[in-house]
């Protein structure tokens, strides 16, 4: 039988617990998880092809070098620890510039310059073929690679219709003059690619700011402002307005990958 003294001690402890335990009310504000925050966003990039072409033509005319890297590529390499080796064939390319002509040169003989990078597809084939699930797509559309899981099988490189992935035949650190500590270093024997500067995105979202990838920042500071980045789930964002007001092209859209790099004003459209 419980003594009177023990009964009073137990009831007193229970009362104290009721007083000290915080009560959850309808007004309680819950902090959103990173996944919930990301689901509210879908990041994408838009390219003004006319401005990009003008930038490259002026750089080539000034330097005489058709392989010159424009400000966007230089900034991307520096920001993301992309190495440069003596033998160009070993260089990873997160962003590169391609020259192209339209299908009917007799109608429009003009040549255009466009940036090529990871398209962060809605249905990324690289993710589908990855043996170790190292390649994955976040709720906000960013396609990433977990370097700790990548075994360098290169199936993703074969599956990518945009040639956006590179294999590290050499330790990247051997081709770097300086290192950005904010970006993870890769190793020899793994695949890497553009991340839309995901470290900048996550930091900006935490602060309630608009993220700006390094290439976009450099394009507006040193180039022609051809690149625009933003959240296409926000109808008031600059990129949403561009997509509404222009005829845009997605590379190899017929493959059903739904790429999220959009090219505007290609062919004077």
Swiss-Prot record:
Q: Which UniProt keywords apply?
A: 4Fe-4S, Cell membrane, Electron transport, Iron, Iron-sulfur, Membrane, Metal-binding, Oxidoreductase, Signal, Transport
Q: Name one GO cellular component term.
A: plasma membrane
Molecular function (GO) terms listed? 4 iron, 4 sulfur cluster binding; metal ion binding; oxidoreductase activity
Q: Binding residues for [4Fe-4S] cluster 4, per the UniProt record?
A: 130, 150, 153, 156
State where it is primarily located: membrane
Subunit annotation: Consists of five subunits: an integral membrane subunit, a cytochrome b-like subunit, a cytochrome c subunit and two iron-sulfur subunits.
Q: What is this protein called?
A: Hdr-like menaquinol oxidoreductase iron-sulfur subunit 1
Taxonomic source organism: Archaeoglobus fulgidus (strain ATCC 49558 / DSM 4304 / JCM 9628 / NBRC 100126 / VC-16)
Top-level taxonomy: Archaea, Methanobacteriati, Methanobacteriota, Archaeoglobi, Archaeoglobales
